[in-house]
């Protein structure tokens, strides 16, 4: 009796393990849900997904939604997109939204957009409801030197045919900013821009800025416009300051050259004085030699001494008169 009980429990345990393994590899509830929704899927197909490491619910549930929406999508297409790393549920939702909005979008196109890293569902929604992109303040300078700042609102619609390989929102903002700057810069007076800001949007819109992008520009509206700095006056002030600094540098250079020349002349004067002193020191020797050789007499020597004394006296009187005049 005990052996029979043990055998019974062993059989029950093996049966439970077998059922657990069976339900792990065979998603019966998912298969029943698909049958209830009218989607015919072989149970062996679901088992094959398990073996290929595909989560069956990630493929079957979107297939049920696509079938209910009337889309002719096969399970092989969805599984292939899943194995490629795509978001199956998002692609199916985008196809359903495009089908409801009468937008032509095939599964291959939607899968390619999804694998390219674009949000295909958002693209379909933007095709139905255009998106508004607001730019920051963009500054341009008119010909009169006044800075004008403008903020624009760009209404764009997604172009599904150009989503793969097309430029994004940053390119749209950059191109519109470039158009605003060039339009403001072409005006002779900033007042014309303030009086007619619509001129900016019309000029920019006519340049075909959406070429090569994933969007179609519907409208460009100037949301705000403001006056900035007087760039012309600032540039003139900077130029005047630079000219002043250059003039000061040149004046300082000339002053330094004058000081150097003055010092050089003083050095030359001292050099000449030294030569004079040196020459004066040789005069007594020359006179002694002249007296010794008989070239001059004693009376001649006395006359020279008298002339020297008279000269010294006149120099002294001249210096005294000069000092009195200065006082």
UniProtKB/Swiss-Prot annotation:
InterPro entries tied to this protein: Band_7 (IPR001107), FloA (IPR022853)
Membrane topology, as annotated: Multi-pass membrane protein
Localization terms from the record: Cell membrane; Membrane raft
Induction: Expressed during sporulation stages IV/V, part of an operon with downstream gene BMD_4542.
Transmembrane segments: 6-26, 28-48
Keywords per UniProt: Cell membrane, Membrane, Transmembrane, Transmembrane helix
Pfam family, one: FloA
Assigned GO CC terms: membrane raft; plasma membrane
The keyword Cell membrane belongs to this UniProt entry's keyword annotation: yes
Task of the protein: Found in functional membrane microdomains (FMM) that may be equivalent to eukaryotic membrane rafts. FMMs are highly dynamic and increase in number as cells age. Flotillins are thought to be important factors in membrane fluidity.
Subunit structure: Homooligomerizes.
Family note: Belongs to the flotillin-like FloA family.
Protein name, UniProt field: Flotillin-like protein FloA
Organism for this UniProt entry: Priestia megaterium (strain DSM 319 / IMG 1521)
Gene: floA
């Amino acid at each position: 009796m005990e052996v029979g009980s043990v055998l019974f429990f062993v059989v029950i345990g093996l049966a439970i393990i077998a059922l657990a393994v069976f339900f792990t590899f065979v998603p019966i509830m998912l298969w029943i849900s698909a049958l209830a929704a009218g989607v015919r899927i072989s149970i062996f197909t679901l088992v094959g997904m398990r073996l290929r490491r595909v989560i069956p619910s990630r493929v079957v549930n979107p297939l049920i939604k696509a079938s209910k929406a009337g889309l002719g999508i096969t399970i092989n297409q969805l599984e292939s997109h899943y194995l490629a790393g795509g978001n199956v549920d998002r692609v199916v939702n985008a196809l359903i939204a495009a089908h409801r909005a009468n937008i032509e979008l095939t599964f291959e196109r939607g899968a390619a957009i999804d694998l390219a890293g674009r949000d295909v569902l958002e693209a379909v929604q933007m095709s139905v409801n255009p998106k508004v992109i607001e730019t920051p303040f963009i500054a341009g300078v008119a010909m009169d030197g006044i800075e004008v700042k403008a903020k624009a609102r760009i209404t764009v619609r997604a172009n599904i045919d150009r989503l793969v390989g097309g430029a994004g929102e940053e390119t749209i903002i950059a191109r519109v900013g470039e158009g605003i700057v060039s339009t403001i810069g072409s005006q002779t007076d900033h007042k014309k821009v303030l009086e007619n800001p619509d001129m900016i949007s019309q000029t920019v819109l006519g340049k075909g800025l959406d070429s090569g992008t994933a969007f179609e520009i519907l409208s460009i509206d100037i949301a705000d416009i403001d006056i900035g700095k007087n760039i012309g006056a600032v540039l003139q002030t900077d130029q005047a300051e630079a000219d002043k600094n250059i003039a000061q540098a040149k004046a300082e250079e000339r002053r330094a050259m004058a000081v150097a020349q003055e010092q050089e002349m003083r050095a030359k004067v001292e050099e000449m004085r030294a030569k004079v002193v040196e020459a004066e020191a040789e005069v007594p020797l020359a006179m002694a030699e002249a007296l010794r050789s008989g070239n001059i007499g004693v009376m001649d020597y006395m006359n020279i001494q008298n002339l020297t004394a008279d000269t010294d006296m006149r120099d002294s009187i001249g210096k005294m008169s000069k000092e009195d005049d200065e006082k």
